[in-house]
């Protein structure tokens, strides 16, 4: 999970939820989150060393291992990293650090994945540039974020995030009622401030080319990926 400002708020909110994160996260996304994560990983060409940023309990890292990648995971939450360590043992090298100050040299990794991070960062443009810094030329950076559906799906999305998410969070597990109430505002605010055209500028400014965008599940999930120049 991410960490000062929006980062600190998110870290404090999610920190105690590690033991139930995988199960409840899948339910709150109506079963879509695992599908989105698999699609994210499928964007990468086979082989190589991948840095998985905001690795959390290791859901994306696990998909990367299944596809034969060497994986390094990074997160700011020691609790989440402890759960990832239990999941992987020595199969994944784990680091506790901030995504906007990575403890790696330039061009250290073949590819990079990042999940549900940028909307929590105080300067997402600078964070994306920092992520791209550690990827070798020709490598891919791939990001998964929650999105805001358009068209006829928008009213249904608003109903779900305003009523369904908080209620479901309250029923499913302790602590998740606050997350349910927090997520809708967080997602809506991020996309209002940062429409896709602005985000594409971030990617280009970070030295990423051929940037592609795929909206999944009527726009509830958004995967972006681009090649490091």
Q: Predicted regions span which residues?
A:
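N-terminal, positively charged/glycine-rich alpha-helical extensions of SAM-dependent methyltransferases
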Residues: 1-20, 161, 172, 176
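Conserved alpha-helix/loop element of class I SAM-dependent methyltransferases that forms part
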Residues: 30-47
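Class I SAM-dependent methyltransferase SAM/SAH-binding core
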Residues: 49-101
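A short SAM/SAH-binding and catalytic strip from SAM-dependent methyltransferases
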Residues: 110-124
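A short glycine-rich, Lys/Arg-flanked "PGG" loop and its adjoining helix->strand segment in the class I
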Residues: 125-140
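C-terminal alpha-helical "lid/dimerization" subdomain adjacent to the S-adenosyl-L-methionine
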Residues: 148-202, 212
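Core SAM-dependent methyltransferase catalytic element
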Residues: 207-229
């Amino acid at each position: 999970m991410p960490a000062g400002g929006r980062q600190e708020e998110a870290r404090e909110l999610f920190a105690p939820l590690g033991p139930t994160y995988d199960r409840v996260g899948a339910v709150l996304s109506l079963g879509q989150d695992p599908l989105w994560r698999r699609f994210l990983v499928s964007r990468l060409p086979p082989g190589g060393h991948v840095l998985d940023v905001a690795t959390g309990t290791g859901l994306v890292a696990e998909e990367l291992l299944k596809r034969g990648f060497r994986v390094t995971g990074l997160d700011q939450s020691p609790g989440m990293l402890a759960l990832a360590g239990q999941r992987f043992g020595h199969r994944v090298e784990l680091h506790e650090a901030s995504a906007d100050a990575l403890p790696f040299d330039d061009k250290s990794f073949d590819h990079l994945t990042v999940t549900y991070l940028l909307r929590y960062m105080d300067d997402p443009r600078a964070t994306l540039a920092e992520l791209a810094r550690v990827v070798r030329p020709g490598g891919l950076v791939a990001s998964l974020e929650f999105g805001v559906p358009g068209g006829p799906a928008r009213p249904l999305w608003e109903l779900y995030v305003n009523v369904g998410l908080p209620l479901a969070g309250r029923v499913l597990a302790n602590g998740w009622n606050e997350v349910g109430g927090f997520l809708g505002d967080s997602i809506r605010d991020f996309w209002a401030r940062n429409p896709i055209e602005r985000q594409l500028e971030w990617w280009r400014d970070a030295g990423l080319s051929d940037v592609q965008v795929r909206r999944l599940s009527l726009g509830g999930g958004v995967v972006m990926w681009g090649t490091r120049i």
